[in-house]
């Protein structure tokens, strides 16, 4: 029997191959990074270069689900569009029903449940996306969650998904400290530094979104990102000069 054709059938060694193939599709997607700061949440995405005549505003990997929640994804954009639309409807329904915005965990659990149903239904295939979902609960607590095609989800302080996730995660494990997220600017710089591990052409290929407590989502413009990149490069040069002085 060909176990990789049937979505609902386990292989003898316990694999659901279609779910694993969906996870491989995620690994081919653009790198996305999320970091939870003290008063801020930041998402950064590697921007792929667009065709000369294409309007780059139509190619977005970061989107708002509600006033207090937004997400970035890696994987198949068309699959993500379905998940995003359903999540937005759920956010609106929740607001109408209980007159409060969703918590970040609530909408993450909804998205994870939606993905899980597609791993257990005949005639369907899993969604080929992973998502980083960030925002603030109504008590002002910053949150960061990650979901994958199997329908599992976890809370994180910082995480990465997509093509360069392994090297970016290693960078974050080394450099994520309380001092590194002490201020909003330092948190933003940490995300940019993490992305620069895999993005070759500097700030022009980075998309960045930030949300501060009690403030709406803000997409940073290219000039702001370039300013942060310039500051990071300057800090690197100064650190290298200090190292050279110590060795001499």
UniProtKB/Swiss-Prot annotation:
PROSITE patterns given in the database record: PROTEASOME_ALPHA_1, PROTEASOME_ALPHA_2
Cross-referenced SUPFAM superfamilies: N-terminal nucleophile aminohydrolases (Ntn hydrolases)
UniProt xrefs under CDD domains: proteasome_alpha_type_7 (cd03755)
Biological processes annotated in GO: proteasome-mediated ubiquitin-dependent protein catabolic process
Entry-linked InterPro entries: Ntn_hydrolases_N (IPR029055), Proteasome_alpha (IPR050115), Proteasome_alpha-type (IPR023332), Proteasome_asu_N (IPR000426), Proteasome_sua/b (IPR001353)
Organism domain of life: Eukaryota
Record SMART domains: Proteasome_A_N
Keywords: Cytoplasm, Nucleus, Phosphoprotein, Proteasome
Presence of the UniProt keyword Disulfide bond in the record: no
GO CC term, one of those recorded: cytoplasm
Transferase among keywords: no
Gene3D superfamilies according to UniProt: Glutamine Phosphoribosylpyrophosphate, subunit 1, domain 1
UniProt subcellular location: Cytoplasm; Nucleus
PTM annotation: Phosphorylated in G2 phase.
Job of this protein: The proteasome is a multicatalytic proteinase complex which is characterized by its ability to cleave peptides with Arg, Phe, Tyr, Leu, and Glu adjacent to the leaving group at neutral or slightly basic pH. The proteasome has an ATP-dependent proteolytic activity.
Membership in a protein family: Belongs to the peptidase T1A family.
Listed NCBIfam families: PRK03996.1 (NF003075)
Oligomeric and partner information: The 26S proteasome consists of a 20S proteasome core and two 19S regulatory subunits. The 20S proteasome core is composed of 28 subunits that are arranged in four stacked rings, resulting in a barrel-shaped structure. The two end rings are each formed by seven alpha subunits, and the two central rings are each formed by seven beta subunits. The catalytic chamber with the active sites is on the inside of the barrel.
Family matches, as PANTHER family: PROTEASOME SUBUNIT ALPHA/BETA (PTHR11599)
Name under which the protein is recorded: Proteasome subunit alpha type-7-A
Record organism: Xenopus laevis (African clawed frog)
The organism's taxonomic lineage, starting at the top: Eukaryota, Metazoa, Chordata, Craniata, Vertebrata
Gene field: psma7-a
